[in-house]
Design a protein with these regions (language model features):
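Structural marker of alpha-solenoid helical repeat scaffolds
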Residues: 42-44, 78, 126
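Short coil turns that delineate tetratricopeptide repeat
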Residues: 45-46, 80, 121
Length: 131
């Protein structure tokens, strides 16, 4: 009657259409990543966090999960923040944790549970203003 708890079939179709990357977009993202990697060598501190997050977002759009995780982890090392990168990283950790649980890989499962705990600590630190 009200549609509570029911998934919108139209939004699923739209999301599937958006996931297809054109060759031009892939090339553009790879160029962006390359330029940002060069740019990051020339700066230090908190500015690096922003650029690493941009690199991570580009890798995420390319569906390169391991590179995405690496870039977002470097971003959080440079500066703790709770932005899009944080949310995507938490989502990827949860996905990796679920895959490890499904494969009965206890070692990987513990690694990703620990990483998720660290992410929760980052959230607390940012909320409290701790650096």
């Amino acid at each position: 009657m009200f549609g509570f708890g029911k998934k919108d079939k139209e939004s699923k179709k739209e999301a599937a259409a958006e996931e297809v990357l054109t060759e031009e977009r892939k090339e553009e993202l790879l160029r962006t990543i390359s330029l940002k990697k060069e740019e990051i060598k020339q700066i230090a501190g908190e500015e690096q966090a922003k650029i690493y997050e941009e690199i991570g977002l580009a890798f995420y759009e390319l569906n390169e999960e391991d590179n995405t995780i690496d870039a977002f982890e470097k971003s959080l090392q440079a500066k703790k923040s709770v932005g899009d990168g944080y949310k995507i990283l938490l989502k990827l950790y949860n996905k990796k944790r679920a895959e490890a649980a499904k494969a009965n890989d206890e070692k990987s499962l513990q690694i990703y549970l620990k990483k998720m705990d660290q992410m929760m600590q980052v959230s607390k630190d940012v909320t409290r203003g701790v650096r």
